[in-house]
Amino acid sequence: MRLFIIGNGFDRAHNLPTSYWDFRTHLETHYPDFLAAFEQHYYIVPNDSEEFKKNLLWNDFETNLANIDEDIIIEDALGVEMGLESGDVGIEDTLRIHFRSEYQYISKLAVYLKQWVKTIPLAATRPITSQISNNNKDIFITFNYTSVLEDTYQIDPEKVLHIHGSLREYDDDPILGHGNRNRIEDIKAKRNEAIIWSDEKKVSICRVIEEYYNTTFKNVANYMHKLSSLYKYRPQEIIVIGHSVAGIDLPYYKRINDLTNRKALWKVYYFDKTKEDCMRQSLIEQGISHKRIQMVDCAEFYDLT
């Protein structure tokens, strides 16, 4: 039995528009005012180049969700006049309401993300690899929201785990978020310092930014329980395709390695030759022995193109 770990590169290899830049295009078409306001908090303006927007935010969208410039936000917010007759006395509740409305983008992002996933066209998608077949007993963990495995390859949905949600009725809705816990701890420290100095206005601003970080935080520990069924399958081979083996998803690899008794062979397909060593090292850092890792060009995987 084999376990496939599948990332967004798999969908993109099928020529599906599933990058976060494609998500931005959806927002630009249907929610331009929201997009402009959202990007403004990352100091992106409409006239900026596509390359600049991609590098600053969209190329690594989930990681960059936490990269708002909180110092500038705090400085700007401290200068906001709320028009209260009592000055700054009792201003905290008013400020929290004000800035919550300013920074509650993530709830809308989640709604728009689900809408976008529904628009991704799968009808014309055809198989491009012979390695995935519904005749095998293989099981699948996918980081993708789409149903390419189920629809294009006719894989039994019971064999497919959408670790971060999908459009299936019994799954979580699509989930996105950053993994930068340090930003949360840093803003807590600033809030506590403001409490010491009785700076009610700054306390309120820090709390709202902290809420934003917490709301946009994807705590992978909350989804680890979904992997528990691996213990009974005990795959002999684990195949990674279309995933960068990096970022906030790395803890899953350690957990998968542990649940398979650290015995399975790992065949990892890379798209970019220059990332091969980095991907291998990431796996080693998760406790996977280099002797059990085989790196392969993904062109060998897509043998029906």
Where are these regions (language model features)?
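Extended charged low-complexity segments that act as oligomerization/scaffolding linkers
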Residues: 19-59, 212-219, 287-305
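Extended, H/D-rich, highly charged conserved domains that either
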Residues: 37-208
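Acidic/glycine-enriched edge-of-secondary-structure segments
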Residues: 195-221, 232-246
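A Trp-anchored, charged/polar loop motif used as the substrate-binding/catalytic surface
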Residues: 119-129, 212-230
